Amino acid sequence: EEPFLNKLDSLFTVKLEGESLSDVTGLIGQYAHGNEPSHHVTYLYALAGRPERTQELVREIFDTQYKNKPDGLCGNDDCGQMSAWYMLSAMGFYPVDPVSAEYVFGAPQLPKMTLHLADGKTFTIIAENLSKEHKYVDSITLNGEPYTKKTISHEDIVKGGTLVYKMK
């Protein structure tokens, strides 16, 4: 894991130098958030045992790459992917492997969200003590029970219930 994490760290810390790349936007090191196929990369830290790094990067991306104005997205919203990353990451998870039906935990960005599902069910996501200073997940519960997995399944979400992040 350590060699992988070192390579991943270098992606976010080594600056892009040389030729000007006019269509590359949203750079953090060499990670280009404006290039949608790389959106899952920040969540690889969580899978490799460093969820706090995923949580830091998600907060940094929210703070630097999205603005509430007409040109508030870096890159462009090809097929809605920039918006999809924003919405899923705001809920605190993201599908690193979209065909697995599993979402990797990051850190929520809103204090409360409710998804209205089929058959009148809801899935509520609560981030207790969320602030810019409290951007790290301390613990998670699903329907009142401690939840320690790195991922949540699509099946668990569509059953309905309540996911609570305790932030620190």
Where are these regions (language model features)?
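Active-site core of glycosidic bond-cleaving carbohydrate-active enzymes
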Residues: 1-124, 129, 155, 162
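C-terminal beta-sandwich/jelly-roll accessory domains of carbohydrate-active enzymes
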Residues: 129-168
